[in-house]
A protein has these predicted regions:
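Intrinsic-disorder/low-complexity, polar/charged segments enriched in Ser/Thr/Lys/Arg/Asp/Glu/Gln
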Residues: 14-18, 55, 65, 100
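Beta-strand/loop substructures that line and gate deep hydrophobic ligand-binding cavities in soluble
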Residues: 80-132
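Hydrophobic/aromatic beta-strand elements that line small-molecule binding cavities or substrate pockets
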Residues: 19, 68-72, 88-94
Length: 158
């Protein structure tokens, strides 16, 4: 997985991950853009309503949900939605038997929680890869904290 942080200001930038996935574009689309797909790698998320201005729902597990608005939806190549004050974007490029997934979190409001989100997305992308390769991917708390520290240093470096 390749990663790049395009810093624009002290508080804004784009965190980009690019990963080649085993699987055709429709299979990958179904993993990243449907409730059934999310259940496999990010079970707290469901699709309330697909399409532009539709909703992605984040279940806090206590009966409360956060709604994120879908801002771009072009099956099977593009899904973009609000993520707190930022935006996440999944772009798929068909390579036949494989698919390139380019994930971007556009950071317009950098907070102390943002590195935690980026570390989480890093792990989610590895889970997606594992699902498509029929292998289990799990992380320890120490592995998560190492990723968190890495992205905290990257996002907040002067």
């Amino acid at each position: 997985m390749q990663e790049t942080y395009n810093k624009q200001t002290d508080k804004t930038g784009d965190m980009i991950f690019e990963i080649e996935l085993k699987g055709d574009i429709e299979t990958v689309w179904n993993l990243i853009a449907t409730t059934k797909g999310f259940e496999q790698w990010f079970p707290e998320i469901s699709v309330g309503e697909p399409g532009v201005n539709g909703l992605i729902l984040f279940d806090f597990g206590d009966g409360q949900y956060e709604e994120s608005t879908i801002t771009a939806y072009e099956p099977p190549t593009l899904l973009q939605y609000d993520w707190d004050k930022n935006t996440v974007r999944f772009e798929l490029t068909d390579q036949g038997d494989t698919t390139i997934l380019t994930f971007t979190e556009s950071i317009v409001h950098l907070t102390t929680h943002t590195p935690r989100d980026i570390a989480g997305w890093h792990m989610c992308l590895q889970r997606i890869q594992g699902i498509l390769e029929s292998r289990e991917v799990s992380f320890t708390e120490d592995e998560f904290l190492a990723l968190f520290d890495k992205y905290q240093a990257l996002l907040f470096e002067k």
